Amino acid sequence: MSDFYHKPVLLEESVHWLVSESGMYIDATLGGAGHSKEILHRLETQHLLSNSLLIGIDRDANAIRAATTRLATYAAHAHILRGRFADLKLLLETNGLLDSGNHPIRGILLDLGISSHQIDAPARGFSFQQSGPLDMRMSDTAQLTAAEVVNHYDERSLSKIFFDYGEEREAKWIARKIVEARKQTPLETTAALALLIRQNLNRKSPVEQTKTLARIFQAIRIEVNGELDELKAVLQAAHEVLSEKGRLVVISYHSLEDRIVKQFFNECASEDWGPKGVVLDVPIKTATMKILTKKPVLASEEEIQENSRARSAKLRVAEKI
């Protein structure tokens, strides 16, 4: 388990909102199983475990191995599946876990972004702070890599990715410099890409350069893994499979993710009574979820001091009605 360490963010808050009664709980972003273990522990302490089941989903083989070890003491109540969380409904169906009368789906947790282990492993290529291959795949079975994006996407496509997924104002400039540089030598490592970007941002302070690097690497990672499309798909799937009063708990780490979650919750919680002036007995569209967190739940200063990754975390909760 030591090869996949990840300190869970907003652990107490997320499990508090998630666990209500016995049934099935899904950790769709299993990682090192920090949240999953706490969910099972909470069910146990509330005497709900005997008729409950935890489903953990992850596409990272290292995470699956670590989680299996970590949850060994709860093996009878934990079922781990390897796959993309966007395929949540299909994974449940193919494993005979959907529409299980004994285990209605009471809660689904999504802890978005990447794990500490993935960031800290140079060979995964997620971090600009240490040199590794330009990979950034969350699953080793995926085809598209960061190297493919950086070395083969045209300038316009790179610029769009940097602007749309990184919200980077220097998107066009950086895309142009990458295309110019790769004509001489392909960019094969995170260090080479980071150095190129820093060299072309020398008018900026080191702090500003680092922020730009974070945005560019985030943008490439989102493109490689299709993260925003995956998020939209899993939100819809989660909404479909949740039982009545089941809760969807989502932790996001940047504005793009949070915007999608907030918009989805608002759409599900709204009614449509048609155009003004038209009197209807029933709405065209009824609300299917109730938002339980009017404002996102944020990490405490104490948690941020212990885990800097918690600084940007936002937790939102909605309940199916």
Curated annotation (Swiss-Prot):
It is found in: Cytoplasm. Its EC number is 2.1.1.199. It is an enzyme of class 2 (transferase). One of its GO terms (cellular component) is cytoplasm. GO terms for molecular function: rRNA (cytosine-N4-)-methyltransferase activity. It comes from the Bacteria. Disulfide bonds: none annotated. Keywords: Cytoplasm, Methyltransferase, rRNA processing, S-adenosyl-L-methionine, Transferase. S-adenosyl-L-methionine binds at residues 33-35, 58, 85, 111, 118. SUPFAM superfamilies: Putative methyltransferase TM0872, insert domain, S-adenosyl-L-methionine-dependent methyltransferases. GO terms for biological process: rRNA base methylation. It catalyses: cytidine(1402) in 16S rRNA + S-adenosyl-L-methionine = N(4)-methylcytidine(1402) in 16S rRNA + S-adenosyl-L-homocysteine + H(+). Specifically methylates the N4 position of cytidine in position 1402 (C1402) of 16S rRNA. Belongs to the methyltransferase superfamily. RsmH family. HAMAP family: 16SrRNA_methyltr_H. This is Ribosomal RNA small subunit methyltransferase H. It comes from Chloroherpeton thalassium (strain ATCC 35110 / GB-78).
